[in-house]
Regions:
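Short glycine-rich, Thr/Ser-proximal phosphate-binding strand/loop in the N-terminal lobe
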Residues: 12-55, 227
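Glycine-rich phosphate-binding loops at beta-strand->alpha-helix junctions
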Residues: 322-345
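Phosphate/pyrophosphate-binding loops at sites that engage ATP/ADP/AMP, CoA/4′-phosphopantetheine
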Residues: 68-83, 189-196, 311-322
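Adenine-nucleotide phosphate-binding core of ATP-dependent small-molecule kinases
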Residues: 264, 271-275, 282-317
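Glycine-rich phosphate-binding loop of actin/hexokinase-like ATP-binding domains
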Residues: 149-253
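Short beta-strand-loop/turn "lid" adjacent to the catalytic site in phosphate-handling enzymes
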Residues: 69, 73-121, 142, 148-157
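Glycine-rich beta-strand-to-loop/alpha-helix junction loops that act as flexible
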Residues: 9, 88-91, 207, 325-333
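Glycine-rich phosphate-binding/hydrolytic loop that grips phosphoryl groups
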Residues: 353, 357-388
Length: 388
């Protein structure tokens, strides 16, 4: 069985075609800057190809993707009939979805209803779903929700201390995100350790442009940093993460801001970008900090501290800690970020091997033999989990 997985952003499209009999990735790629100077990076047979191919819509991007999949020189597939189904990543399912579902018009309407809690993510997913249905009519489309993995979080941890009527009326509670990634990584670390997932207490640190931590006990999410929306939790590249709520109303009054303007500041102008004044790219900030830029150094320190603070908090949530696992763009590639985070956790016996951490590539242990907690780097594979 061959499954095509689509992950749509507001101006991007990530795709993978997976042979589920072997779980082999037959082809994958990323379409970037849809609507502008679009280009696609296509990977097949261990080779990478880049095409500058401007498109205005996700439908046009999917059409060109299918051309690449069918191109005889790559020998991927001969016909779209070989694709048995299409899986879509959907960020927010709120309390409307407790599992993956086959998509129909009713499902699309409910995904749209949830969009108020993840407007950029859910709207993009709907765009991709519509485009896929149009490009490949008759194929079953399945929605896989980031929020489903967090359905096991206990009530006292997902409930906010505001009047309960707002939960009853509007469903205001912690939902969590990156569930597909957290599920994959927590299962993968059990495989790597050769231990049953049911006995492990793990904190997964999904550190990318968007970032969240998840406390996983026995293979189930028991707490996570993101909340009602993907804005909560640790500071991110451009998102604020957790704040004193009064900051929002104080700034709105002082700056005469509308709710939409305030939301834009918190989502697009905050986090390490807001602190550093340099960039939303961790690599740029590290380069500036190395030159002596104090605000860049402040951004890195604040980021590392907050991640470590949540890991420490989750030791209580888990009743102990066996493993810390770093994943996603920053977690997998920024050794200095991992080092700074773990330095804050020395009081818990966390110790990394500096050489392994610095030289590390791909997947493996970076903690020292003396560390009381194992520290690993495991590349995430959300697409495989969606396909499964």
């Amino acid at each position: 069985m061959k499954v095509l997985v689509l992950n749509c952003g507001s101006s991007s499209l990530k795709y993978q075609l997976i042979d589920m009999d072997t779980e082999e990735v037959m082809a994958k790629g990323t379409y970037e800057r849809i609507g502008e100077q679009s280009f696609v990076t296509h990977k097949v047979n261990g080779e990478k190809f880049r095409f500058d191919h401007p498109v205005k819509t996700h439908k046009e991007a999917i059409d060109f993707m299918t051309e690449l999949l069918l191109d005889p020189k790559y020998n991927t597939i001969k016909s779209l009939a070989e694709i048995d189904g299409i899986g879509h990543r959907v960020a927010q399912g709120a309390d409307k979805f407790s599992s993956s579902v086959i998509i129909d018009e009713d499902v699309i309407a409910k995904i749209d209803e949830c969009a108020a809690l993840a407007p950029v993510h859910n709207k993009a997913a709907i765009t991709g779903i519509r485009a896929a249905m149009e490009a490949m009519p008759g194929k079953p489309n399945v929605a896989v929700f980031d929020t489903v993995f967090h359905q096991t979080i206990p009530e006292e941890r997902y409930t906010y201390p505001i009047p309960y009527k707002y939960y009853e009326k509007y469903g205001i509670r912690k939902y969590g995100f990156h569930g597909t990634s957290h599920k994959y990584v927590s299962a993968r670390i059990a495989e790597l350790l050769g231990r049953p997932v049911e006995e492990l207490k793990t904190v997964v640190c999904h550190l990318g442009q968007g970032a969240s931590l998840c406390a996983v006990k026995g293979g189930k999410s028991v707490d996570t940093t993101m909340g009602l929306t993907p804005l909560g939790g640790i500071p991110m590249c451009a998102r604020s993460g957790d704040l004193d709520p009064s900051i929002v109303t104080y700034l709105m009054k002082k700056e005469n801001l509308t709710p939409d303007e305030m939301e834009l500041i918190l989502n697009k102008e905050s986090g390490i970008l807001g602190l550093s004044g340099v960039s939303a790219d961790f690599r740029d900030i590290e380069a500036e900090a190395a030159k002596g830029n104090k605000r860049a150094e402040l951004a890195i320190s604040a980021y590392a501290y907050k991640v470590a603070q949540y890991i420490a908090q989750y030791i209580v949530s888990l009743g102990g800690l066996d493993t810390i696992v770093f994943t996603a763009g920053i977690g997998e590639n920024q050794y200095n970020a991992r080092r700074r985070i773990c330095e804050n956790l020395k009081c818990f016996g966390v110790e990394i091997d500096e050489a392994k951490n610095h030289e590390f590539r791909d997947e493996g242990r970076i903690s020292s033999p003396n560390s009381k907690v194992e520290v690993w780097v495991v590349p995430t594979n959300e697409e495989l989990m969606i396909a499964r």
